[in-house]
């Protein structure tokens, strides 16, 4: 239950609002870092055998090779099989674009766990051209309870097939299949 706060002046109220807004994260979540559920990472790693975690920290990586804030994954060349669970804040579009471009130009396979924000520009520009796996219900992340948003696994490949899949812990089934004849230039 939240309590109502009384402010002495309009200026004090505005300062408090700016302070709260600065602390908050885009998409109405208290954090923009969500550690991948173990069961999901294990299943995807078994399928794709990841070489590198392209945006991690020493505390949350599940792979021996990873890029953190210091090494800045956005500035690295992504090749091979890449895992990406990016910060879910304002920079997520840059991460998704980098995944798409790396798949097209570097022949990387980039598997992303991201919020299913189908109304965003990056979703329409990039995710719509990839394999997308939606989850039944909301994921429960390792460092928190259920996410306040729906999630999806997006798989970028050079000559990938755009496929939409719904996933539950009991299995999955294909909903839509669209085949692109050739890779688009970036």
Located regions from the model:
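Class I S-adenosyl-L-methionine-dependent methyltransferase catalytic core
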Residues: 19-186
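BZIP DNA-binding basic region
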Residues: 1-22
